[in-house]
Amino acid sequence: MASQGTKRSYEQMETGGERQNATEIRASVGRMVGGIGRFYIQMCTELKLSDYEGRLIQNSITIERMVLSAFDERRNKYLEEHPSAGKDPKKTGGPIYRRRDGKWVRELTLYDKEEIRRIWRQANNGEDATAGLTHLMIWHSNLNDATYQRTRALVRTGMDPRMCSLMQGSTLPRRSGAAGAAVKGVGTMVMELIRMIKRGINDRNFWRGENGRRTRIAYERMCNILKGKFQTAAQRAMMDQVRESRNPGNAEIEDLIFLARSALILRGSVAHKSCLPACVYGLAVASGYDFEREGYSLVGIDPFRLLQNSQVFSLIRPNENPAHKSQLVWMACHSAAFEDLRVSSFIRGTRVVPRGQLSTRGVQIASNENMETMDSSTLELRSRYWAIRTRSGGNTNQQRASAGQISVQPTFSVQRNLPFERATIMAAFTGNTEGRTSDMRTEIIRMMENARPEDVSFQGRGVFELSDEKATNPIVPSFDMSNEGSYFFGDNAEEYDN
């Protein structure tokens, strides 16, 4: 479970471990990313990629997707039972980009899934290393969070597109386990539950029979995960109501949407992990770094330090701005898509601009795009400072619930206020306080009305110099308190479609 009741750190969820001490956790996370690195090096050898080609983020993503597809049991089974034209269920592949005569060319590669599984296991001491696979899924999810908007998905489930800051992890596959559940935003969990309830409304047999029993267990599990993300008693009590409903229907959907809105101010605990592309771990392993011996953490200085010393390239379309492409990938690497731009800019040491002002499309290149005009450039992924990633949502201690902004889910544990437009959010709460959950709703609304946009979250927490690996001297930045800091303002990004 990702609820806070089971006090396992993210790294333990990530590595499937039971309670371990800090050193053991660092070692097992190190083992996990080291395995990813070894796998990547082997794949580059198999594909005969040059050093430069191996550092290309698009090639890294293709290789990551191949291994995720090779281990996707459910889909593999489905593909074998429903053979479709032109798809070999036993093979996986994707575009590999190579440098030829001063130009980039795309080449489609195909591999036996069995072969990929063999290489992956070999790189991971003969084990399946599911934790490493989940880690790659979270990196892809963080990249999607920074790249695409989910307006359409929000509207489809009856939520407000301005609730985008609650949608972290909305593209994570179902099989991403406890580590995946920990990084999902409140909106993502609400959306999964609403989809489920809607199916139950439309399909009489959804909750019935042997299958229905399994469905019910999944429903209650998701409710518990969401409950564990809320930090106030009233929100949790409402989740109990939703979970215990005999026959979930529109009343539950209403309650869930109410809870999602309330999370804009009474924020949920959502974990943040810096998951880097496989090629970054590959580069470190190739240079002789021993992750398992040195230990590694996804929430401390390690990913920052790794990115300081890694040179990664990206393909650039003719009218894209390489600096903007770098910002996109930097945000993805630190899971900072929903962080306040003031904080991100301070840590990165260069101004991080809202997405509407970025001249760049996604990192992946569609198969119909013209390679003739493609160029490549170095991604600038270094930072000025580092900060500890948070899982708290940044509610201040007085109320255990503080100010939110229509668009911040803090990533870094750094002191700041979380500005928000109370009028905008509260406008959504007029009317309906009747029904079973009326007292909880009233209580939640009261807490929200008492929240002040100027309250300081993460009191006394600061950023650290990159030389300060033990985090001894926090530098507490001072921010312009009134300044809005959301990445999604005036947004014109593409929609995420599978």
Curated annotation (Swiss-Prot):
A motif (Bipartite nuclear localization signal) lies at residues 198-216. One of its GO terms (molecular function) is structural molecule activity. Pfam families: Flu_NP. Keywords: Capsid protein, Helical capsid protein, Host nucleus, Host-virus interaction, Ribonucleoprotein, RNA-binding, Viral nucleoprotein, Viral penetration into host nucleus, Virion, Virus entry into host cell. One of its GO terms (biological process) is viral penetration into host nucleus. InterPro entries: Flu_NP. Late in virus-infected cells, may be cleaved from a 56-kDa protein to a 53-kDa protein by a cellular caspase. This cleavage might be a marker for the onset of apoptosis in infected cells or have a specific function in virus host interaction. The keyword RNA-binding applies. It is found in: Virion; Host nucleus. GO terms for cellular component: helical viral capsid; host cell; host cell nucleus; ribonucleoprotein complex; viral nucleocapsid. Belongs to the influenza viruses nucleoprotein family. HAMAP family: INFV_NCAP (MF_04070). This is Nucleoprotein. It comes from Influenza A virus (strain A/Turkey/Ontario/6118/1968 H8N4). The lineage of its organism: Viruses, Riboviria, Orthornavirae, Negarnaviricota, Polyploviricotina.
